[in-house]
Regions:
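Short loop/turn motifs at secondary-structure junctions
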Residues: 1, 78-81, 250
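Mixed-charge interfacial surface used for oligomerization/domain docking
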Residues: 3, 9-23, 28-30, 90-104, ...
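Acidic/glycine-enriched edge-of-secondary-structure segments
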Residues: 48-64, 192-206
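N-terminal glycine-rich anion-binding loop in soluble enzyme alpha/beta folds
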Residues: 3-62
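Residues at secondary-structure transition points
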Residues: 38, 42, 63-66, 117, ...
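Short, contiguous strand/loop micro-motifs
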Residues: 1, 58-59, 85, 117, ...
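Glycine-rich phosphate- or other oxyanion-binding loops that anchor nucleotides, phosphorylated ligands
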Residues: 53-56, 62-89, 96, 100, ...
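A short glycine/small-residue-enriched secondary-structure motif
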Residues: 44-48, 77, 99-104
Length: 280
């Protein structure tokens, strides 16, 4: 049997877990001396409450190889194949943990760790498509080839409402964050080839949201795509972004999701983004 596993730095729509048989191994969220399993011991709202209360951004850590081994044994039976699809290895050690765990359980399961080169709902979309291909009769090799082909063509573009959370998490320097706040500058970040880079800075939120659409539009033009809006505690902006994006793309499906805690911890509330996922 084919099992599909992703980590908590990815997102799926609530119904996908049961509909497509996707299992999620939690990320560890560290507040001070306490550790919480994302989605098990702390949800998104609980996370933001703690951030508001303590004015500190928690640290996040990938599942350990031991946690992976325990998780694989929990969700699979001897002889199963496990596609283990994870957040870009350039931003996290999760993929490395999965590789180590795969070696440990190689006599029990055929684990295939995959670096998605993506995050958030990009990982979820890969997992969903993998299950669809399996149900269509495709082999494991064909499914892996599909993932390896599409993962570098999907694009994620984000705008941060503030650099304060990135500063607290150590992603940007204090001076940069202070200057951006004073000038009301909104940074634009693009996830490309597994790397997340700040590519532009604009002066208003409205201009930033426009660029989140314009940047991938320049690349995809009229190609058929899936659109996925992302937001961190700002569903209104996420919905507005998605509705505007629909006017500019040849989309076949559109959806919206909260940003995973593991991602939101580094980017902060008010972050809004768009994933453009190619269909050909």
């Amino acid at each position: 049997m084919l099992r599909i596993v992703m980590d908590g730095a990815g997102d799926i729509l609530p119904e996908w877990s049961a509909e497509y048989g996707i299992d999620v191994i939690p990320v560890n969220i560290l507040f001070g001396e306490k550790s919480y399993l994302q989605g098990v011991e702390i949800d998104n709202e609980g996370f933001y409450k703690m951030v508001d209360e303590y004015r500190k951004v928690p640290k996040t850590s990938q599942p350990s190889p031991h946690q992976f081994v325990e998780f694989y044994r929990k969700i699979a039976q001897k002889g199963d194949t496990i596609l283990s699809i994870h957040i870009t290895a350039k931003l996290s050690g999760t993929y490395a943990s999965a590789i180590a765990a795969a070696q440990e359980v190689k006599d029990e399961f055929n684990v295939i760790p995959i670096d998605s080169a993506l995050g958030s709902l990009g990982i979820g979309l890969l997992c969903r498509e993998a299950r669809k291909l399996e149900r269509a009769g495709k082999s494991i090799d064909e499914i892996v080839r599909y993932i390896e082909n599409v993962k570098y063509r999907a694009r994620t573009t984000l705008t941060l409402d503030t650099l304060e959370y990135a500063r607290m998490s150590g992603r940007v320097k204090t001076l940069q964050a202070a200057l951006a706040s004073a000038l009301n500058i909104k940074p634009i970040a693009v996830l490309r080839d597994g790397d997340l880079n700040m590519t532009e800075r604009v002066r208003t939120r409205k201009a930033a949201l426009s660029r989140v659409i314009e940047i991938p539009k320049e690349e995809f033009k009229d190609a058929p795509v899936v659109l996925a809006a992302l937001h961190a505690r700002d569903p209104k902006s996420g919905e507005a972004l998605l509705e505007e994006a629909k006017k500019h793309f040849n989309y076949k499906e559109a959806m919206m999701s909260d940003l995973a805690i593991a991602v939101a911890a580094n980017l902060g509330p008010g972050t809004v983004g768009l994933i453009v996922y190619p269909l050909e």
